[in-house]
């Protein structure tokens, strides 16, 4: 007992206090142990209560094996509490099961049953990560997003094995999508252009809008439909216009040929004439002809007043030609100035051509027919005798032309300016006298210059058209009042040509009459003189032909005799007459109804 005593002697200061301290020391030790265990349990339960607070804080409903709910409460057990609890019966030294009114047991742990409490708490801790552990009630029920991200992400990612938002959010960006759309559109356009574009020119295109182009190709009728690929659409319009021009130029080609022939004729006839003068004559003649046709050529037509420039040209031609006419009898006219000799030869021709008395043709019968190669030449009024019949000079190729008293256009039309220039007489005093000699030379070999039958007659060296026995100075009421014909320059020595006075100005007893009167010398149609005009014409092969083509021209008689009897004589050529289309015309009057015996001539088609 010594050690015990020693210990007692060491520890006890007061025996009473020592006994009391031992008793209390045990209690406090047990209390400390219980407090430690209870503190641990309290911390664990408090965490579980904070997580699983359903109805009120501090109580949690736990499912047990027998499906009874257990209310776990904190027990701050003291000795008094333990004693009071012991009245209900202890199952264990540290854990007491207390039945309440709700058939639920309050479990309080005292440290001995730590494993059971820990298992419960661990089970709750394991359950807190599950979705049902998320609070569905409480202050922040709608704002508790602790598990929403994970839960929503997991559901979003794993539903159906793919993410729900992949189709919308993980697709290409907008610009990538735009490029993809453009790529598809380009592919679509490429396909459609391949199908529709090629089809336009081919089978399908003929059904759609290409019939116009196909019609243009069919319109050609040249067999060139397959010349170009049908898919090529560029030259289609040009080809259509080309076809139109090709078709339209067929008719003008004839006129072009005629104009070319006329230019050739002018070149043959006017070898010595300057081209500018010829052009001037042509233009003036065309204008004069237009003026005459515009007036319908009836008795009410105003007189024709030629311009002074034409007079000058006429005078010049007369002066140059009067002295050369007798030289022109040689058969080869090459090198001669036929442009200058034309007027003089015509002036002298009037006497010879009408001298055979073919007579004035009946009223209403004139045939203006143009030779095929007859052209615009205004300055080729006469052909030299002995010229070949097939030369370009159209005077030998005039088909039978019947002059119509109502169609005496040729006598008035001033296509050759020398004719119009002779309307003023003062300058013709000396040269016209020489023209009389010229007329005699031209008329040689013609036979008698005496009129026979009804028609032309000679008066003062000039052939005068009218009824037989009617002289220039004798007025005959039977003579047509329209466009009368008389001796031109009869007061000046008798010029071998005709003058025609317009209505209201004819004064046969005074010759030319008043100075204002316009006398038109007949340079073209020696027999083409007579009554009023008759406009109707029929065009045959580019020539004018009157209503009654059966009557030959009166002036053709002398030409006929010239060509048949006198091959070396100068054949009379009718005055060229420029029509609206630029082709010259000449008139011959042949009242005897005898067709000319020219080899080139076709009489009245």
From Swiss-Prot:
The gene is MLN51. Residues 552-567 have a biased composition (Low complexity). PANTHER family: PROTEIN MLN51 HOMOLOG. Belongs to the CASC3 family. The modification Phosphoserine is found at residue 30. Residues 41-57, 166-192 have a biased composition (Basic and acidic residues). One of its GO terms (molecular function) is mRNA binding. This is Protein MLN51 homolog. GO terms for cellular component: cytoplasm; exon-exon junction complex. Residues 214-228, 247-265, 367-380, 578-593 have a biased composition (Polar residues). Weakly interacts with EIF4A3. Residues 1-88, 101-132, 151-275, 350-380, 544-605 are annotated as: Disordered. Residues 1-16, 30-40, 75-87 have a biased composition (Acidic residues). It is found in: Nucleus; Cytoplasm. GO terms for biological process: mRNA processing; mRNA transport; nuclear-transcribed mRNA catabolic process, nonsense-mediated decay; regulation of translation; RNA splicing. Core component of the splicing-dependent multiprotein exon junction complex (EJC) deposited at splice junctions on mRNAs. The EJC is a dynamic structure consisting of core proteins and several peripheral nuclear and cytoplasmic associated factors that join the complex only transiently either during EJC assembly or during subsequent mRNA metabolism.
């Amino acid at each position: 007992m010594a050690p015990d005593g020693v210990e007692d002697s060491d520890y006890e200061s007061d025996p009473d206090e020592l006994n009391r301290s031992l008793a209390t020391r045990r209690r406090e030790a047990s209390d400390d142990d219980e407090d430690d265990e209870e503190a641990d349990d309290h911390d664990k339960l408090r965490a579980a209560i904070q997580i699983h607070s359903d109805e009120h804080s501090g109580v949690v409903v736990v499912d047990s094996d027998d499906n009874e709910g257990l209310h776990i409460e904190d027990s701050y057990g003291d000795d008094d509490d333990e004693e009071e609890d012991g009245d209900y019966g202890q199952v264990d030294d540290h854990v007491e099961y207390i039945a309440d009114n709700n058939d639920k047991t309050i479990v309080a742990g005292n440290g001995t049953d730590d494993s059971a409490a820990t298992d419960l708490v661990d089970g709750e801790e394991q359950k807190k990560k599950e979705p049902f552990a998320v609070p569905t009630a409480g202050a922040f029920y709608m704002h508790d997003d602790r598990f929403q991200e994970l839960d929503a992400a997991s559901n979003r990612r794993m539903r159906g094995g793919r993410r729900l938002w992949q189709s919308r959010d993980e697709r290409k960006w907008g610009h990538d999508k735009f490029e993809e759309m453009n790529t598809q559109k380009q592919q679509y356009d490429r396909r459609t252009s391949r199908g529709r574009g090629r089809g336009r020119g081919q089978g399908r295109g003929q059904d759609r809008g290409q019939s116009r182009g196909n019609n243009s190709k069919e319109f050609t009728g040249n067999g060139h439909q397959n010349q170009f690929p049908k898919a090529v659409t560029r030259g289609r319009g040009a080809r259509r216009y080309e076809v139109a021009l090709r078709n339209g130029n067929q008719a003008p080609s004839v006129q072009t040929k005629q104009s070319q022939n006329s230019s050739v004729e002018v070149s043959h006839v006017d070898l010595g004439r300057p081209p500018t003068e010829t052009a001037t004559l042509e233009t003036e003649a065309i204008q004069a002809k237009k003026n005459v046709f515009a007036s319908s050529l009836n008795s009410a037509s105003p007189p024709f007043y030629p311009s002074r420039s034409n007079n000058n040209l006429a005078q010049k031609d007369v002066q140059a030609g009067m002295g050369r006419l007798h030289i022109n009898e040689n058969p080869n006219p090459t090198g001669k100035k036929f442009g200058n000799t034309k007027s003089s030869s015509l002036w002298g021709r009037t006497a010879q051509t009408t001298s055979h008395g073919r007579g004035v043709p009946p009223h209403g019968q004139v045939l203006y027919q143009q030779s095929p190669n007859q052209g615009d030449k205004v300055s080729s009024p006469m052909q030299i005798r002995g010229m070949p019949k097939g030369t370009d000079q159209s005077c030998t190729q005039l088909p039978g032309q019947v002059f119509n008293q109502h169609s005496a256009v040729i006598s008035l039309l001033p296509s050759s300016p020398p004719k119009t220039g002779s309307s003023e007489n003062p300058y013709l005093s000396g040269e016209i006298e020489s023209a009389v000699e010229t007329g005699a030379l031209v008329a040689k070999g013609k036979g008698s210059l005496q009129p026979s039958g009804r028609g032309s007659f000679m008066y003062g060296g000039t052939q005068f058209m009218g009824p037989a026995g009617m002289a220039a100075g004798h007025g005959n009421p039977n003579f047509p009042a329209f466009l009368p014909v008389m001796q031109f320059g009869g007061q000046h020595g008798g010029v071998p040509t005709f003058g025609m006075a317009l209505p209201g100005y004819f004064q046969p007893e005074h010759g030319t009459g008043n100075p204002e009167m316009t006398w038109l010398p007949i340079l073209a149609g020696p027999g083409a003189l007579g009554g009023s005009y008759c406009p109707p014409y029929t065009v045959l092969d580019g020539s004018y032909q009157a209503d009654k083509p059966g009557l030959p021209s009166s002036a053709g008689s002398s030409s006929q005799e010239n060509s048949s009897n006198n091959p070396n004589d100068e054949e009379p050529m009718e005055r060229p007459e420029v029509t609206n289309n630029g082709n010259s015309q000449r008139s011959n009057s042949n009242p005897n109804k005898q067709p000319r015996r020219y080899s080139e001539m076709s009489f009245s088609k």
